[in-house]
C-alpha cells in the first residue's frame, strides 16, 4: 500500500463539526449587524448556491443595492476564511497525532533518513544537505496583517475545542471568546486603504519567524540529528534547512527597495533573533539554580560566572545562573552594536564566540552528570544558534538585467571608456567588461561627472550590501539574481557593478552572480549562455572560491505566461538536464533555485511531488525555492504546519537524491521524443490564443478583474513594470491572479487537451503510452496531477458570466474557444489518469472544495455584478472597495492567488 499524504488522515467529521460551530456564530453575528431582510437574503443566497440554482442567485444579486452588497460580500468573504482555519487546526492536530503514534506518512523525516542510512555515503548526504525556502513579498497577497492576527486567535481557540468537548474547558466561556473574535473580524477592514510599504512587508514576515519558523527550523534540525544518530550516523554541523529572503533586497520592478530597506531588512531580522536568544537565556537563568554546595561545575563556567555583574548574595553558589547572566549581558551589547551601532568592549565578535560559551556550559553539565538539563530549552537555544546565527535569513538581491546594462553604460561613458556601450555587439560588450574586470583597477564611479538617480541608487544598495557583509558576516547576502538574463554580458555587467564597491575582484566574488532564465527562449538559450560563462578564466576563479558551486535560478511564472503550462514545464525540465550536464563537463556543481509561485500557473502545486519529479542528477545537495507571500500564511502560519512543510521539503530532496543514485535515467529516454512532439503543439496552440488572436487582449481586460486587481493595495511592488498596453507588459503574478478570480485558471491548463488529443489520434497505442508515462514517470505524473487540481477549482459557468461583460460578440466568442479546450482537457486528463472524476487521488482536497465551493461561488457572482456597476459608473470611489472584498474572499476560498 502506498504511503498516504498526511492530509488524507484528516478528520472530516471534526472539521465539519467545527465549521458548523463557526458558521452558526457567524450567522448570529451577521444577523445582529444588519437588517433582518438583508440577513434573509444571505440565507437565501446560501441555499441557492448549495442547490446550484445560479440563475435565481444572479437575479437576487442584481436587485441588491450597494449597501446590501457590502455587508453580504463581507459575510461570504469571512466564511471561507473560517473554513480554512478549521482545516489548518485539524492538520496541526494530525501532524502531532501521527508523529506521537509513530504513523508513517509521505514526507516523514524518520522514514526518509532510514532510507538514506542504507546508502554507503549516508553521512556525506545528510551532512551536506541544505534546502533553502526563500520568503518573498507578493504583489497579490491579499490578507491584511490585522486579519492574520485575528485568524491566529481563532486558530488557538479551535485548538482548544477538543478540551472543551472533554469538559476540561468551560464551553460557554470558549464560545463567547470565539464569538468576540468573529465579531471583530466582521467589523475590521479586510482590505488595506493604503498600499503596503517595503518596511511593512519586512515587519509582517518577521511575525512568521516569531510564531513558527524559529521553533520549526530548530525542532527539525534537532530531529534530523537525533534520527541520524539512531542509525549510527554522527553528523558534525548539519544545516538541513536554512532560510532565505527577498524582502528588502528584491528591487526588480520595485523602485521602493533601496539601500535603506536592505539595511532595515538585515538589521530587523538580526534584532528578532537576538531578542529570541535573550528570552531563552532569561528562561535558563531562572531555571538553572544548580548550587555548588551540591554539584561541581567546570572551570570554564566558573570563569563566565565571575565575569557576571549579578552580584546578588543569593546567587553566590549558583554559577550557572551567573554565567547565563553574563552571556545575556554580552549578547545584549552585541545586539546594540550590530543593530544600533553602539560600541562596547564586552560583546561577541561573531556567533562562534557566543556558541562557544553555550558549549562550555553544556560540557560542564555533561562532566557533572546533569545531562537531563541538556534537553528542552537549552538544546532548543543551541540548535537555534546553529541554525540562524546572528540573523534569520540570507537576503537575496535582485535586479533586472536592463537596469544593470544602463548603469554600466553610464559608468563607462562617464569614465570615457565607451560612449555608447548599449549599441555594442555581445562580443564587443564582453570584451569591454572583461577588460574592466581583469586589467583595469579603476573605480569607474569615482569621477566628478553627475550621476543619474538610478545609478546612484544602484551603487548605494551595493555599498550597503558590502557594509552588511563586513558587519554581520558573509552569509547575510550570498547571491545577486539577474532577472531576464539572456547573455554572458548580463552576468559580467553585474560583476562590474559589484567591483565598484569591492565585492568582486579578479580572484573572488563575495556575492555569487546568479542568472535568472525566465522566458521559453531564454531557457532554450541558457545552456549556451552558461557554457560560454563557465569557459571564462575569471568565472572559473569566482566559482572555485564558492567551492565549485554555481547557482542558476529558473523562472516558472514568466515561462508559463510566455508559452503555456506544458511548454513551461517541459522547457524547464530539459534546461535543468542540459545545465546539469554542462556543469559536469566543467567540473562545476550546478544548483537550481526554483522560482515557483503558489498557483500551478506559476509553478506551484504540492512541494513534495514537485521536488521528487525533478530531472535525475539535477538535485545534488543544495536546493533553493521561493515561498511566495500569499502561501506563506497557509504553509507556515503556525509552528506545526511550518514543521510539516519544512519536513516535506527536506524529505523530498533526500528522496530525490537517493532515488537518482539507484534508478537508471535511461528508463525515461523513450518519453522525451513524445514530450517534444506534444509540447510543440501545446506551445503553438497557447500562443495562437494569447498572443496571436487579435481579440484576446480585449477579452482578458473585459472578462477578468485585472484592472481591479491592479488597483488593490496589496503589495509594495507595482502590478506591471510599465503601462499595460499588451499582454507581454503585464507581470505574471497579476496575470495568473486574474484568471484565478474569474475561475478560468487558464495558465494552469490551456493547450493541454488539444496537444494530447492530436498525439493520441496519431496512433492507437498512443493513449496507452501516455498512461504508462503517467504511472512510471514522476515528472509526467506531477505535471498532469497539477492540471487535474486546477481544473477542479475552475468553474466554466462562472467564467461565462464574466465573458458576458465583453461588449463585442467577436471578443465574447473567445470564451467558447476556451470552453472547448477546457472540456477536452478534462476528458483527456481523466483518460490518461484512468479516473472517473477529478481529484480522485486527492480525496482530502475534493472534500474541502465540495463544502467550501458554494460559499465563495456566491462571491464570484457578486463580484461580476459589482464590476458591471463600476463600469456603468454606478459605484462611488469608496464603494469600489467592495470589489476588493470579493477578490479577497475568492482568493481565500481558493487558498492561493497569483
Swiss-Prot record:
<comment type="function">
    <text>Forms oxaloacetate, a four-carbon dicarboxylic acid source for the tricarboxylic acid cycle.</text>
</comment>
<feature type="active site">
    <location>
        <position position="138"/>
    </location>
</feature>
<dbReference type="GO" id="GO:0005829">
    <property type="term" value="C:cytosol"/>
</dbReference>
<comment type="similarity">
    <text>Belongs to the PEPCase type 1 family.</text>
</comment>
<dbReference type="InterPro" id="IPR033129">
    <property type="entry name" value="PEPCASE_His_AS"/>
</dbReference>
<keyword id="KW-0120">Carbon dioxide fixation</keyword>
<dbReference type="GO" id="GO:0006107">
    <property type="term" value="P:oxaloacetate metabolic process"/>
</dbReference>
<dbReference type="InterPro" id="IPR022805">
    <property type="entry name" value="PEP_COase_bac/pln-type"/>
</dbReference>
<keyword id="KW-0460">Magnesium</keyword>
<feature type="active site">
    <location>
        <position position="561"/>
    </location>
</feature>
<protein>
    <recommendedName>
        <fullName>Phosphoenolpyruvate carboxylase</fullName>
        <ecNumber>4.1.1.31</ecNumber>
    </recommendedName>
</protein>
<dbReference type="GO" id="GO:0000287">
    <property type="term" value="F:magnesium ion binding"/>
</dbReference>
<dbReference type="Pfam" id="PF00311">
    <property type="entry name" value="PEPcase"/>
</dbReference>
<dbReference type="GO" id="GO:0008964">
    <property type="term" value="F:phosphoenolpyruvate carboxylase activity"/>
</dbReference>
<dbReference type="InterPro" id="IPR018129">
    <property type="entry name" value="PEP_COase_Lys_AS"/>
</dbReference>
<dbReference type="InterPro" id="IPR021135">
    <property type="entry name" value="PEP_COase"/>
</dbReference>
<keyword id="KW-0456">Lyase</keyword>
<dbReference type="GO" id="GO:0015977">
    <property type="term" value="P:carbon fixation"/>
</dbReference>
<dbReference type="InterPro" id="IPR015813">
    <property type="entry name" value="Pyrv/PenolPyrv_kinase-like_dom"/>
</dbReference>
<dbReference type="GO" id="GO:0006099">
    <property type="term" value="P:tricarboxylic acid cycle"/>
</dbReference>
